[in-house]
């Protein structure tokens, strides 16, 4: 039985070895198949990547070789350069060159400007031909010259108004306080027409006229004083006849009617009315009553004394009214 078991055991071992070998061979064959598929896939991927690289290289070569792309690249580079540059460089590029004119060119341009300040296109072209300049330069020169001319005209007008017409207007447009310092307009009715306000200022019309005291008194007196004046003026011829060398035709003798020397020639009985009050004085009710009382007192007290020539006898009617007391 043991002998029978041993060969069976060997056969079994051989069979197991064959099966193992076959199984190992099968596994190895499968592994080889997997490696083949991987290698084939890698080779295919490598081919594809190579094709892509070749395609990219072809595209890049074709892009760089085209003129449009080259111009685009140049423009992009110039833009970057412009952006990198500073602002003063731009200003220097945009600034125009100043034109330096010769003396002959300036003489020709000035002579044309004196004749015509606004030349048209044809005239400017002719001037450009004469002066060897461009039409644009001639146009700019005329524009600047007109601006300078306008500025000079404005300055001259301002100087004329300041120097020529200034003193005249200042003399005519003085304030009222400087022109009439002796009285104010608010107290016009209270003060009246005093001769001080008239004598402080030069009025050639009134100073040249020899004003009649009777007419001036009739202008500025009340109705009561006018009636008394008419009666007293009626007595003037009889009073003047007693004075030797008196002339009624002259106005100076009429101015001397209010002097006390004429009143002494008239007797007391021949003058029943009060003598006229000083002329050219504005009278209200209070002033007229005070003046009449003072004159009555003088009439009774001063007739017996010798008369003294007053210094106000040679004055005019306006000044005489100020010197005599009221």
UniProtKB/Swiss-Prot annotation:
- Please tell me which stretches of this chain the record labels as motif OAR: 288-301
Any GO BP annotation: heart morphogenesis
Nuclear localization signal (motif): residue ranges: 294-298
- Cysteines paired by S-S bonds: none
Please state the protein's primary subcellular location. nucleus
* Bias (Basic and acidic residues): 69-82
* Stretches the record annotates as Disordered: 17-37, 58-106
- The protein's superkingdom reads Eukaryota
Q: Which residues bind DNA?
A: 94-153
Q: What induces it?
A: By nodal/nr-1 in the left lateral plate mesoderm.
Which InterPro entries does the entry mention? HD, Homeobox_CS, Homeobox_Pitx/unc30, Homeodomain-like_sf, OAR_dom
Subcellular location per UniProt equals: Nucleus; Cytoplasm
Per the record, its GO cellular-component terms are: cytoplasm; nucleus
Q: Which UniProt keywords apply?
A: Cytoplasm, Developmental protein, DNA-binding, Homeobox, Nucleus
Q: Name one Pfam family in it.
A: OAR
Q: What does this protein do?
A: Involved in left-right asymmetry of the developing embryo. May play an important role in development and maintenance of anterior structures. Could play a role at the interface of lateral plate signaling and heart and gut morphogenesis.
Can you tell me which family this protein belongs to?
A: Belongs to the paired homeobox family. Bicoid subfamily.
Q: What is this protein called?
A: Pituitary homeobox 2
**Origin species:** Xenopus laevis (African clawed frog)
């Amino acid at each position: 039985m043991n002998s029978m078991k041993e060969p069976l055991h060997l056969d079994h071992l051989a069979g197991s070895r064959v099966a193992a070998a076959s199984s190992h061979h099968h596994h190895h064959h499968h592994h080889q198949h997997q490696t083949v598929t991987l290698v084939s896939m890698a080779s295919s991927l490598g081919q594809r990547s190579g094709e892509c690289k070749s395609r990219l290289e072809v595209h890049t070569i074709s892009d760089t070789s085209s003129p449009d792309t080259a111009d685009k690249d140049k423009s992009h580079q110039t833009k970057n350069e412009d952006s990198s540059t500073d602002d003063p460089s731009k200003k220097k590029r945009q600034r125009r060159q100043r034109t330096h004119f010769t003396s002959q060119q300036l003489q020709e341009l000035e002579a044309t400007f004196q004749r015509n300040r606004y030349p048209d296109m044809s005239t400017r072209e002719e001037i450009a031909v004469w002066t060897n300049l461009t039409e644009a330069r001639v146009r700019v020169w005329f524009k600047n010259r007109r601006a300078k001319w306008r500025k000079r005209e404005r300055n001259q007008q301002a100087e004329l108004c300041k120097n020529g017409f200034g003193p005249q207007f200042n003399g005519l447009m003085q304030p009222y306080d400087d022109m009439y310092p002796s009285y104010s307009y608010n107290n016009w009715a209270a003060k009246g027409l005093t001769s001080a306000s008239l004598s402080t200022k030069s009025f050639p019309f009134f100073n040249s006229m020899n004003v009649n005291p009777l007419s001036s008194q009739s202008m500025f007196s009340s109705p009561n004083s006018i009636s008394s004046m008419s009666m007293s003026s009626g007595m003037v011829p009889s009073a003047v006849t007693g004075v030797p060398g008196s002339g009624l035709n002259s106005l100076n003798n009429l101015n001397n009617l209010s002097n006390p020397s004429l009143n002494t020639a008239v007797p007391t009985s021949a003058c029943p009315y009060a003598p006229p009050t000083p002329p050219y004085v504005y009278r209200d009710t209070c002033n007229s009553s005070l003046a009449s009382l003072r004159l009555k007192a003088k009439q009774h007290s001063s007739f017996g004394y010798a008369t003294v020539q007053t210094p106000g006898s040679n004055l005019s009617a306006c000044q005489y009214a100020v010197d005599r007391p009221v």
